[in-house]
Amino acid sequence: MDSNTVSSFQDILLRMSKMQLGSSSEDLNGMITQFESLKLYRDSLGEAVMRMGDLHSLQNRNGKWREQLGLKFEEIRWLIEEVRHRLKTTENSFEQITFMQALQLLFEVEQEIRTFSFQLI
């Protein structure tokens, strides 16, 4: 995994956790949780690709990994829409920068997961 991506995840999660968005803080916590989950999933998929012989093990361990992959893409699309919405509604420049970087990171992670999954197929 690219060390820049790791630091990007950590930076964005840290900054999102410091935001105070009033009544929507529960929604923001949900987004943070999904970001963390997405990072873990991407990391595990990347590790499986690094050990190409692990494909058989991955398929045995999780017979529904393609279904899970589809759900992750839905989750990414939902997060992208949520981040876009927040970006449009906030006037705070710190939040705008954070959400713009989060959006860029989501696009990068989506591409990485697609690349990993094609290598596993």
From Swiss-Prot:
Transmembrane segments: none
Keyword Transport: yes
Chain positions of motif Nuclear export signal: 12-21, 85-94
Superkingdom, taxonomy of origin: Viruses
Biological process per Gene Ontology, one example term: exit of virus from host cell nucleus through nuclear pore
Localization in the cell: Virion; Host nucleus
Quaternary structure and interacting proteins, as annotated: Interacts with protein M1. May interact with host nucleoporin RAB/HRB and exportin XPO1/CRM1.
Family statement: Belongs to the influenza viruses NEP family.
UniProt protein name: Nuclear export protein
Protein source organism: Influenza A virus (strain A/Memphis/1/1971 H3N2)
